[in-house]
Amino acid sequence: MVSQSLSALGACVILAAALPGAVSAQQAGVEPRADAVLRSMTAYLSGLKKFSVTTENTLEVVTTEGQKIQFTAPATMTVARPNKLVAQRRGDIVDQMMYYDGKSLTLYNPASQHYATVPAPATLDAMLDVAYEQLGLVAPGADLIDTRAYERLMLDVQSGVYLGTAVVAGQRCHHLAYRSTEVDWQLWVREGPQPAPCRYVITSKTMAGAPQF
């Protein structure tokens, strides 16, 4: 294997926009039912001590001619709070693994066998902050696996509505739609005592063609 700088390896990790200040649901004009579902989901996720998820990630690219092209990247992630994370994304434009053990953060590219490791904070939440603020990296699903997920999702929110229910991958889900300055986002949250997210769609409002992720 070949070691190299983490910031160089991180070029294929999706970058996040600058995070503005949080606002309350009332200030943002969020419907009470939408807020209740979001709070229920984030409380459920933050209360899980250990879990694994498999997702199908989609990245939409808009060409100079205005054509939208979609790329997919299946991803798996295992979290053990407070300080363990293993995540992998493999697809058309990314082949990457991320390891965090409470002491260090490592990115590894299986295809090129390049890796990079840096010291990391002792908790997952703190590592996610450092990865973004100092390295410009965002772990898969960072908005949802942070124990402060509600606060992260509510950053710069302008409105939120409850759109009813829909079936996603065989699961009956609550459908939420939120708007912020730079993005619109939708969540489909499973009904019942285990309100896990079944689908999460982000639409950019600042990029030409409004691509979705």
Model-predicted segments: where are they?
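Boundary at the C-terminal end of the N-terminal hydrophobic targeting segment
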Residues: G21-Q27
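Acidic/charged, solvent-exposed loop-and-adjacent secondary-structure segments enriched in E/D, K/R, S/T
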Residues: L107-I145
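N-terminal mature ectodomain segment of secretory-pathway/periplasmic proteins
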Residues: G29-H114, V161
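Gly/Pro-enriched, hydrophobic low-complexity segments
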Residues: G29-P32, E56, T106-L107, A116, ...
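Edge strands and adjacent loops of beta-rich recognition modules
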Residues: T147-L153
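Bacterial N-terminal signal peptides
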Residues: G10-P20
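A short, polar/proline- and glycine-enriched secondary-structure boundary/capping micro-motif
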Residues: T64, Q96-Y100, N109, T117-P119, ...
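Bacterial N-terminal signal peptides that target proteins for export
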Residues: M1-A11
